[in-house]
Amino acid sequence: MAGSSLTSASTSASKTLESAMGQSLTESANAQASKMKMDTQNSILDGKMDSASKSINSGHNAAKAIQF
């Protein structure tokens, strides 16, 4: 009878840990996916800002080149 109780407790503990590991893995994957999306959006915005900055600098340099 004691062996049966120990087996039952062990099985219950294993199921609890398995469930916790599954939830942890899912949460981790979701967080990584969210970070990947955010990193991509930031990269796109950085590229747009760089292009805008280059355009402004080009216009500024062209204006400086005009001599009266």
Swiss-Prot record:
Amino acid composition bias (Polar residues), ranges on this chain: 21-44
Subcellular location field: Secreted; Fimbrium
GO cellular component: a single term: extracellular region
UniProt-annotated stretches for the region Disordered: 1-68
Stretches with biased composition (Low complexity): 1-20
Record's keyword terms, sorted: Fimbrium, Secreted, Virulence
Protein family (similarity comment): Belongs to the HrpA type 2 family.
Function: Major structure protein of the hrp pilus, which is a component of the type III secretion system (T3SS, Hrp secretion system) required for effector protein delivery, parasitism, and pathogenicity. The hrp pilus functions as a conduit for protein delivery into the host cell. HrpA is required for the secretion of HrpN and DspA/E.
Protein's UniProt name: Hrp pili protein HrpA
